[in-house]
UniProtKB/Swiss-Prot annotation:
The modification 1-thioglycine is found at residue 81. It comes from Haemophilus influenzae (strain ATCC 51907 / DSM 11121 / KW20 / Rd). Heterotetramer of 2 MoaD subunits and 2 MoaE subunits. Forms a stable heterotetrameric complex of 2 MoaD and 2 MoeB during adenylation of MoaD by MoeB. During catalysis MoaD shuttles between the two heterotetrameric complexes. The gene is moaD. Involved in sulfur transfer in the conversion of molybdopterin precursor Z to molybdopterin. Belongs to the MoaD family. This is Molybdopterin synthase sulfur carrier subunit. One of its GO terms (molecular function) is nucleotide binding.
Length: 81
């Protein structure tokens, strides 16, 4: 099982802060693609190129491998000012 967390605008758009996935996924990108198919809000919130991912609390590329028991967090890039 994968624990998937959503933060900031990503969470606001989909209205969910966390879900668990039973399916096997090879990469964080495969998880993103799967979730983006859940509907328009999900696709917008998880748009590739406008999203960062952390696996087990470490910032990683979307192409990184994931395994059963991992925590995957999706969030928009942080901006400052």
């Amino acid at each position: 099982m994968l624990n998937v967390l959503f933060f900031a605008q990503t969470r606001e758009l989909i209205g969910v802060d966390a879900i668990q996935l039973e399916d096997d996924f090879a990469t964080a990108e495969a998880v993103r693609e799967h979730l983006a198919q859940k509907g328009d809000k999900w696709a917008l919130a998880l748009e590739k190129g406008k999203l960062l991912v952390a696996i087990n609390q470490t910032l990683m590329p979307l192409e990184s491998a994931v395994k059963n028991g991992d925590e995957i967090a999706f969030f928009p890039p942080v901006t400052g000012g």
